[in-house]
Amino acid sequence: MARLAAFDMDGTLLMPDHHLGEKTLSTLARLRERDITLTFATGRHALEMQHILGAISLDAYLITGNGTRVHSLEGELLHRDDLPADVAELVLYQQWDTRASMHIFNDDGWFTGKEIPALLQAFVYSGFRYQIIDVKKMPLGSVTKICFCGDHDDLTRLQIQLHEALGERAHLCFSATDCLEVLPVGCNKGAALTVLTQHLGLSLRDCMAFGDAMNDREMLGSVGSGFIMGNAMPQLRAELPHLPVIGHCRNQAVSHYLTHWLDYPHLPYSPE
């Protein structure tokens, strides 16, 4: 029996309308009743996730910013990882050949250089939103991550540019087909989950995890039981071909699987 369950949010727990379904909320509550530790492991900001936890009245650990922050049930900061100031400066000030918009994150929030209302659709559940700033005046000492949002082919070309400029000084990953992230070296959900399990006196073998994108790769590959969403990025399936694939987030597939796991643990599972 797993002792900790870790969940990605977008494309995993959240439905395509960016809400948590009632079946999902009910199943999460059942896990807590079984004394299974809940952990939300997401690229979203800690401020937003703390608001969501309050709204759904669930106790859960938080891995946010794709592993840049880990918080306890009480909101205590257990782990932090920031981009080196020189890396943040290079990414912010360089003229990249891209049409993608740039977004900067630190403990105070989400910052960008211009209004992009379409991006706020993903945050209707929480009301979290960006702050408009002059990117060139952004303090460099506390940047957790930098994201680029745009067309996937354009971002793929940008990834090559970033890698050539940064080398091994940053970790690049796609958190969605339309979002490329620049993270501290060694920073990912799997590394953050390792920190958390050590804090809790657990091993990664005691954990199950669910995800759909390349920012979930290390987490899914390191736990005792990793599950890939039916709507996952093809690259993730290719990287972890041995992991089982469950259903689509629109059908609350995590809830569907966990209900079977709780009620019929000895019977084979079918996502249909």
Swiss-Prot record:
Keywords: Hydrolase, Magnesium, Metal-binding. The gene is cof. It catalyses: 4-amino-2-methyl-5-(diphosphooxymethyl)pyrimidine + H2O = 4-amino-2-methyl-5-(phosphooxymethyl)pyrimidine + phosphate + H(+). NCBIfam families: Cof-subfamily, HAD-SF-IIB, PRK15126.1. It comes from the Bacteria. SUPFAM superfamilies: HAD-like. The active site is at 8 (nucleophile). This is HMP-PP phosphatase. Belongs to the HAD-like hydrolase superfamily. Cof family. The lineage of its organism: Bacteria, Pseudomonadati, Pseudomonadota, Gammaproteobacteria, Enterobacterales. Mg(2+) binds at residues 8, 10, 212. GO terms for molecular function: 4-amino-5-hydroxymethyl-2-methylpyrimidine diphosphatase activity; magnesium ion binding; phosphatase activity. Gene3D superfamilies: 3.30.1240.10, HAD superfamily/HAD-like. Its cofactor is Mg(2+). It comes from Escherichia coli O157:H7. Catalyzes the hydrolysis of 4-amino-2-methyl-5-hydroxymethylpyrimidine pyrophosphate (HMP-PP) to 4-amino-2-methyl-5-hydroxymethylpyrimidine phosphate (HMP-P). Coiled coil: none annotated. Its EC number is 3.6.1.-.
